[in-house]
Design a protein with these regions (language model features):
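Active-site-adjacent core segments of small-molecule enzymes
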Residues: 22-329
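Gram-negative bacterial Sec-dependent N-terminal signal peptides
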Residues: 1-21
């Protein structure tokens, strides 16, 4: 895939550049770089600006209680507010843009506890560290002299950041979906499930659409209406529920915990962990999901984060963007 798609894809799932060692970026620096890359749109998200709100429920599989005491897997019906999104900060980007898609879920657990899942439709992230992510954004900044990214800076980024390669390879081989109902979503990061005996298990998860994964052809990408994904999901949920199966991959102690650019071995055990059912879809302006900050570190008892530096960095970055939205900036 070309370097612009790679850089925007990475920006779009979370920004001049030099290849020497640098101090780790702050959350404010990353948000400012996102603004410089895509412009400032007051009151809106700095990344994943385009989205649609959804509502429904989740029913977890009781068998998962062997691994976690989380109320998500009690077998009860858990109310869900969610948001599908298109990665990037351009409010005019068409839905056929070859960027990652996001699915953020807020689960309302018994006792008024809240738990968030914040997923992407790619199995790996485009950076192992916040520095790589930041450098990717900077490498795609427009050169003032040309109004376009500098090819030499982009080339330098690719040559000096091998952790960006797995996402680039995946994006090059996979077109956008025909429908939000036909996308699978990945946890990206590794998490810890903690059971009633305080035993910890490493896990990743994957939401698989009941109707299967279906992608646009190259020809279709050039003919689809700008907001076809939103329109399609609204129409589908009016006709009936749309579902995903949550598949849980059970890790081993030797598996990578802190690098979201590395795949786990394909032979790891996978079990069904629950079913997500969506029954409504609404344009996001003024809807329930619009003001939610889907911080992936908002977790209830029984699930905990790893020390993945990207996962840990997402929380302050989301907060910095959220504050700007709340203040109308």
């Amino acid at each position: 895939m070309n370097s612009k798609i790679l850089s925007v894809a990475m920006a779009a799932v979370f920004c001049t550049f030099n290849a020497t060692a640098q101090q780790a970026p702050t959350a404010d620096q990353v948000v400012s770089a996102l603004e410089k890359l895509s412009g400032v749109h007051p009151g809106e998200r700095r990344n994943h600006i385009l989205g649609i709100c959804v509502g429904g429920s989740f029913v977890g599989t009781k068998d998962v209680q062997a691994f976690t005491r989380s109320a998500l897997f009690s077998g009860a019906t858990i109310p869900v507010i969610g948001r599908f999104s298109l990665a990037g900060g351009n409010p005019k980007a068409p839905d056929a843009t070859k960027n990652p898609r996001g699915l953020a879920l807020q689960f309302k657990l018994p006792g008024n506890s809240i738990h968030h899942f914040t997923m992407l439709n790619v199995p790996v992230f485009g950076a192992a560290t916040p520095q790589t992510f930041y450098n990717a954004l900077l490498s795609n900044m427009a050169d003032p002299a040309t109004g376009k990214p500098d090819p030499e800076k982009q080339k330098q980024f690719r040559e000096t950041h091998p952790d960006a390669k797995p996402l680039g390879e995946f994006m090059a081989k996979n077109n956008p979906p025909v429908s939000y109902a036909n996308i699978d979503f990945f946890s990206i990061h590794t998490f810890k499930f903690i059971n009633a005996n305080n035993q910890t298990t490493l896990v990743r998860w994957h939401f698989v659409p009941e109707d299967g994964v279906k992608r646009l052809t190259d020809a279709e990408m050039g003919t689809m209406p700008a907001r076809f994904l939103d329109d399609d999901l609204i129409a589908k949920t009016k006709k009936g529920p749309v579902r995903w199966n949550m598949m849980l991959t059970i890790g081993q102690d030797s598996d990578v915990q802190t690098n979201p650019t590395i795949y786990w071995p394909a032979e790891r055990k996978t079990i069904q962990a629950g079913v997500l059912t969506l029954t409504s879809a609404t344009l996001q302006k003024g809807a329930d999901c619009e003001k939610i900050n889907f911080d992936p570190l908002v977790m209830a008892d029984g699930i905990a984060p790893t020390d993945d530096p990207i996962l840990q960095f997402r929380s302050p970055s989301y907060a910095a963007s959220f504050v700007k939205r709340l203040t109308g900036n």
